[in-house]
């Protein structure tokens, strides 16, 4: 096994290639998990406080406006610019701007509003009649979310998260350009800077395989959830 890991492919050791792939999966996995948490909160705020939503009033209108503007502003900033701009914040939170863990700060900040908009669209697929029926039965806001809104749109939300995961994969590759590690770092350091075209092609193939796997798994889970509704 050690002999295999120390052998080389296109000028780099297999161990280095596997390590960078693991770093990419680490960034995408944790970034998606944390981003989904914040993204879902933002999405629920947008859905519940929008005009005609479950929660109405002056405060809800202000909250909707603030969250809506925040989501639009962050989504309008290219990830590379966001990555560099919030370096002081990343250093403040993580103590460094280098490494896969430090890269989670800009990745989460980037993906949360992106997922919020995707999840908002999914949640809006729930028929207004279902929400009205829930309110007629005396369900409170939490019960509407837990027993009506989420179950009805879970399959669609899985597809939204699949799209978000693929976007996060691309962002994680860009994180490598500022020391985030992963496949992007491998492409820049050992591929582009050393004019190693075969290695660059290999990293592209790896990313394509990752995307196909994410899309396949997301689609399969979504179909299963829709079938059991």
What role is predicted for each listed range?
Residues 25, 139-171, 218:
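Transmembrane alpha-helices
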Residues 17, 21, 25, 66, ...:
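Hydrophobic alpha-helical elements at and bordering transmembrane segments
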Residues 51, 55, 59-61, 124-131, ...:
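Juxtamembrane helix-boundary/capping and inter-helix hinge elements in multi-pass membrane proteins
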Residues 18-124, 159-166, 206-214:
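Membrane-water interface segments at the C-terminal ends of transmembrane alpha-helices
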Residues 118-157, 187, 227:
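Short cytoplasmic-facing helical segments at TM-TM junctions of multi-pass membrane proteins
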Residues 45-51, 136, 200-229:
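C-terminal transmembrane helix and the adjacent membrane-cytosol boundary/short C-terminal tail
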Residues 1-20:
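Short, strongly hydrophobic alpha-helical membrane anchors
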Residues 89-92, 160-209, 216:
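Non-cytoplasmic
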């Amino acid at each position: 096994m050690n002999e295999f890991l120390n052998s080389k492919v296109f000028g780099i050791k297999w161990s280095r290639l596997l390590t960078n792939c693991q770093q990419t999966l680490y960034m995408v996995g944790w970034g998606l998990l944390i981003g989904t948490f914040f993204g879902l909160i933002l999405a629920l705020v947008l859905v519940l406080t929008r005009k005609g939503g479950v929660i109405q009033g002056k405060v809800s209108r202000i909250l909707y406006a603030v969250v809506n503007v925040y989501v639009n502003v962050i989504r309008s900033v290219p990830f590379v610019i966001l990555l560099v701009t919030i370096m002081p914040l990343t250093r403040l939170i993580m103590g460094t701007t280098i490494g896969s863990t430090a890269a989670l700060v800009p990745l989460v900040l980037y993906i949360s509003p992106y997922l919020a908009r995707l999840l908002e669209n999914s949640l809006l697929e729930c028929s207004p009649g279902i929400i009205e029926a829930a309110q007629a039965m005396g369900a409170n806001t939490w019960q509407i979310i837990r027993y009506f809104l989420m179950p009805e749109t879970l399959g669609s939300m899985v597809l939204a998260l699949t799209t978000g995961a693929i976007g996060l994969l691309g962002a994680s590759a860009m994180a490598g350009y500022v020391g985030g590690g992963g496949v992007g770092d491998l492409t820049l350091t050992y591929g582009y800077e050393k004019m190693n075209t075969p290695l660059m092609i290999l990293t592209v193939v790896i990313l394509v395989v990752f995307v196909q796997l994410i899309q396949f798994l997301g689609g399969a889970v979504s179909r299963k959830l829709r079938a059991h509704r």
